[in-house]
A protein has these predicted regions:
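Positively charged n-region of N-terminal signal peptides that target proteins for export
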Residues: 1-5
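Hydrophobic h-region of N-terminal signal peptides that target proteins for export
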Residues: 11-19
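Outer-membrane beta-barrel porins/channels
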Residues: 21-34, 77-86, 93-410
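Transmembrane beta-strand segments of Gram-negative outer membrane beta-barrel proteins
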Residues: 23-39, 57-74
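Asp/Glu-centered strand-loop micro-motifs enriched in Gly/Pro and often flanked by an aromatic residue
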Residues: 38-40, 45, 84-89
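Outer-membrane beta-barrel pore proteins
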Residues: 40-42, 49-62, 101-107
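Active-site/binding-pocket entry motifs
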Residues: 41, 70-72, 121, 378
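Generic detector of contiguous secondary-structure segments
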Residues: 47-56, 352-359
């Protein structure tokens, strides 16, 4: 049991990072968020640095775009097969942000430059200390930040390309109970904390076919997040300290490549529709390895098979200009899970998701635009088994994410 519990702790780390960076919540731009998370074909503002670097040189002027969001997730658990035991994750709010600055070097320039600093995901989950799955997880906290300097070149009025270098860094903190008790009856605990970093790139092509039709193609590379000196801390009875020494660990956690294609169509002077399709190369995430600086009979280097499968997400959105100052937006998305049966666990349980979004943009002045958006994520209830611990349950996950931001044109 003790060996399996430690294995589950390590496995949970991989679940955290895969959920954090690869699970396509698409919070990197508020206008795009409001339209189902798509933005490959239409460079709405400076956040095209993330969605399609090729659109940067097509912006009319230099822009600054900043936004803050508030993720409020909830997970419901029912134990299988009877469902007699249920639990809910504790209420929490997480605060990802995005900042972009960029545009053409000068009016009429073919070259565009920009910088994006964005959080592809920052969230977590906390269960009650005495819940039935405490030997798998008690709490999770994840923060991640990507920094992307970007350059774009506009060949003509129809075709532009762009490329960005990505430096990614983040932190994680995971705690769980251990099935060991001291003389007072208090259970032991384990905590894994670490900082990770990695590098990648973002490529994009923007095609302005005519006054009504636009296309976009992007490729974001795989990023290997490397933890070189994570901390593993154990609280156990004194007699067992030699079996559970506080130590360091290293690992490499791959975040998958994403290829996207998008189309935008201006139906009339007021209405624009857009469609995005995202291919996520999860199959590259086939295994995970942990190396510890100290080893005991209970603490050894481990290698985990993952068996993720590739997914294709679809995003549909609309922008309607009520007048010159006010725009309304809405969208839908379907985002399937890459996690195979036998690997569904309460760290961050994963299932196919349906997404509804909406938003409003108000042009306060000719230069300043205020944007508010919201996303509701509803996951299909999933019966899952975590084979490592033979832990079974039905999971139902929802999340509400409002956000507010500003865009300023120079």
């Amino acid at each position: 049991m003790m060996k399996k519990t430690l294995l589950s702790l390590l496995f949970a780390v991989s679940c955290i990072w895969s959920y954090g960076a690869g699970y396509q919540l698409n919070l990197q731009g508020l206008r795009q968020l409001a339209m189902g998370g798509g933005g490959t074909a239409v460079p709405w503002d400076a956040s095209t640095i993330f969605y399609n670097p090729g659109g940067l040189s097509s912006l009319g002027s230099w822009q600054i775009n900043a936004s803050a969001l508030f993720i409020m997730p909830n997970v419901e658990y029912a134990q299988l097969p009877t469902g007699s035991y249920t639990a809910n994750s504790n209420a929490q709010t997480f605060y990802p942000f995005n900042f972009y600055a960029g545009g053409p070097l000068k009016k009429g320039s073919k070259w565009g430059l920009g910088l994006g600093v964005y959080t592809p995901f920052g969230s977590g989950l906390k269960w009650d200390d005495n819940w039935t799955g405490r030997f798998l997880v008690r709490s999770i906290n994840l923060q991640s930040i990507f920094v992307q300097p970007t350059v774009s070149y506009k060949f003509n009025d129809h075709i532009s390309v762009g490329a960005g270098y990505i430096y990614a860094f983040g932190s994680l903190d995971l705690t769980q109970a251990l099935p060991l008790q001291d003389l007072t009856g208090a259970e032991g605990s384990a905590e894994l904390k670490g900082n990770a970093s990695g590098m990648g790139f973002n490529l994009g092509v923007h095609i302005n076919a005519n006054d009504k039709l636009q296309f976009g193609f992007t490729y974001r590379s795989r990023v290997d997040m490397k933890i070189s000196s994570g901390n593993a801390t154990f609280v156990v009875p004194t007699s067992l300290l030699s079996n559970f020494p506080n130590t360091n660990f290293s690992s490499k956690l791959p975040l998958p490549e994403v290829a996207s294609v998008g189309v935008g169509y201006k139906v009339n002077e007021k209405l624009t529709l857009q469609l995005d399709v995202n291919f996520v190369g999860w199959s590259a995430y086939d295994s995970l390895k942990f190396d510890f600086t100290q080893h005991t009979s209970n603490l050894k280097d481990e290698h985990f098979p993952r068996f993720y499968h590739n997914t294709v997400a679809v995003r549909l959105g609309a922008n309607y200009d009520v007048n010159k100052k006010l725009s309304l937006m809405g969208g839908l998305a379907y985002d399937p899970s890459p996690v195979s049966d036998g690997y569904v666990s309460p760290e961050l349980p994963d299932a196919d998701r349906y997404v509804i979004t909406c938003g409003i943009a108000y042009r306060a002045t000719s230069k300043l635009c205020i944007i508010a958006a919201a996303e509701f994520v509803n996951s299909i209830a999933r019966d899952g088994t975590y084979d490592v611990m033979n832990f079974k349950g039905t999971y139902k996950t929802t999340a509400f994410t409002p956000g507010i931001g500003l865009s300023y044109n120079f």
